[in-house]
Amino acid sequence: MSSVKLIVGLGNPGGQYEQTRHNAGFWFVEDVARQYNVQFRPETKFLGEAARIQSNGLDVWLLKPMTFMNRSGQSIQAIAKFYKIAPEEILVVHDELDLDPGVARLKTSGGHGGHNGLRDTIAALGTKDFKRLRLGIGHPGDRNQVVDYVLKAPSKTDRALIDDAIYDATRVLPDLLNDDMARAMNELHTKT
């Protein structure tokens, strides 16, 4: 395994999407930036907003692609290529329909599961072998309602549960940054 050098929060740019379920990945990296007291800055060469934190004397990049969800891979590929970050050193944080609000799960690899941001990331990186943090948002129950569901804000109760899961996930971030995925998974999966 490799320690994480790039943390990408998936979401859609623009105020109209800011509070939607599909932006749970943005919420996570924004929370990490607050904890490390850093600001996101527009980075046109990366098609997104980026911030840098330090872990064990090494740079770790935070990225919010500003390409819209279905083109997230372009932004991820641009920053990874520029800083020579391998796919296995990337953590992609995204909303997950198949998990209830309040649940967060780590994975070391996998398919896209119908998530367009992951689909584009896999295509852009040429591999599915990158780490993921899946933030549960619940499912509307009918697959025909998924698009409307992810592009709406969660209820106050669900948002509080998602925020709790984000908090729990940020607590295991030091393990991820120290290349201890097994410990991070164990801690997180027993909490949420």
Curated annotation (Swiss-Prot):
Subunit structure: Monomer.
Compartment(s) where it occurs, according to its Swiss-Prot or TrEMBL record: Cytoplasm
Protein name: Peptidyl-tRNA hydrolase
Presence of the UniProt keyword Cell division in the record: no
Taxonomic lineage: Bacteria, Pseudomonadati, Pseudomonadota, Gammaproteobacteria, Thiotrichales
Keywords per UniProt: Cytoplasm, Hydrolase, RNA-binding, tRNA-binding
Catalyzed reactions per annotation: an N-acyl-L-alpha-aminoacyl-tRNA + H2O = an N-acyl-L-amino acid + a tRNA + H(+)
Family named by the database record: Belongs to the PTH family.
One family name in Pfam for this protein: Pept_tRNA_hydro
Site (described: Stabilizes the basic form of H active site to accept a proton): D95
Annotated GO biological process: protein quality control for misfolded or incompletely synthesized proteins; rescue of stalled ribosome
Top-level taxonomic group: Bacteria
CC terms in the record's Gene Ontology section: cytoplasm
CDD domains per the UniProt record, alphabetical: PTH (cd00462)
Enzyme class, first EC level, given as a word: hydrolase
Described purpose of this protein according to its UniProt entry: Hydrolyzes ribosome-free peptidyl-tRNAs (with 1 or more amino acids incorporated), which drop off the ribosome during protein synthesis, or as a result of ribosome stalling. Catalyzes the release of premature peptidyl moieties from peptidyl-tRNA molecules trapped in stalled 50S ribosomal subunits, and thus maintains levels of free tRNAs and 50S ribosomes.
MF terms (GO), sorted A to Z: peptidyl-tRNA hydrolase activity; tRNA binding
Main location: cytoplasm
Keyword tRNA processing attached: no
PROSITE patterns referenced in this protein's UniProt entry, alphabetically: PEPT_TRNA_HYDROL_1, PEPT_TRNA_HYDROL_2
Residues forming the catalytic site: H22
Site feature Discriminates between blocked and unblocked aminoacyl-tRNA, where: N12
Entry binding sites for tRNA: Y17, F68, N70, N116
EC number(s) given by UniProt: 3.1.1.29
